């Protein structure tokens, strides 16, 4: 997935971070917690599901001004949910879950799926997934292939209140609106 370690290290300074991990073949996993950039204890053996779970709690607990802006801005949380939804679709082999503190139900929940369409179904719903057409394009020369693309587009029957485009190029998220504005500003 290309998760950058320094970003995770930075999170340990502004949130309570707990990492639980187990690899295939191990009898038990290990859990470690961080606070204020410091490991609270040595990794402890624990029961775990195969893979790595990163739990971030009490975000900005030690930065009162930033925490207050989060508490007063549902917009920040909706941006987090939107971003996690996009990554859940692109990285269909990884499970994602995000919920507000105290909420009974997750706002984003995807299981490591067998296909991208399964991830779309779990994140955006059955009606969206049912109205998608798979597209695959390549330069048709496997020996020297320099271009290939796959994805989904909605069919002409689908009507939505809001347009959602999820675009990753070479595994990197591409923020379409931001880049279109930059391109347009170069010419106009």
Predicted segments, located by residue:
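N-terminal phosphate-binding caps/lids of nucleotide- and nucleic-acid-binding domains
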Residues: 1-188
């Amino acid at each position: 997935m290309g998760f950058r370690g320094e970003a995770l290290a930075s999170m340990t300074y502004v949130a309570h971070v707990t990492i639980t991990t187990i690899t295939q073949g191990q009898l038990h996993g290990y859990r470690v917690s961080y606070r204020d950039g410091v490991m609270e204890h040595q990794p402890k053996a624990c029961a775990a599901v195969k893979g790595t779970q990163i739990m971030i709690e009490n975000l900005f607990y030690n930065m009162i001004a930033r925490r207050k802006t989060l508490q007063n801005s549902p917009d920040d949380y909706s941006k987090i949910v939107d971003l996690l939804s996009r990554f859940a679709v692109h990285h269909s082999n990884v499970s994602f879950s995000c919920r507000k503190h105290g909420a009974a139900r997750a706002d984003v929940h995807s299981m490591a799926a067998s296909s991208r369409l399964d991830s779309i179904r779990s994140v955006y719903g059955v009606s969206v997934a049912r109205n998608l057409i798979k597209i695959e394009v390549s330069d048709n020369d496997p020996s020297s292939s320099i271009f290939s693309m796959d994805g989904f587009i909605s069919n002409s029957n689908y009507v939505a209140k809001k347009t959602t485009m999820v675009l990753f190029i070479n595994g990197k998220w591409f923020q379409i609106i931001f880049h279109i504005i930059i391109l347009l500003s170069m010419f106009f």
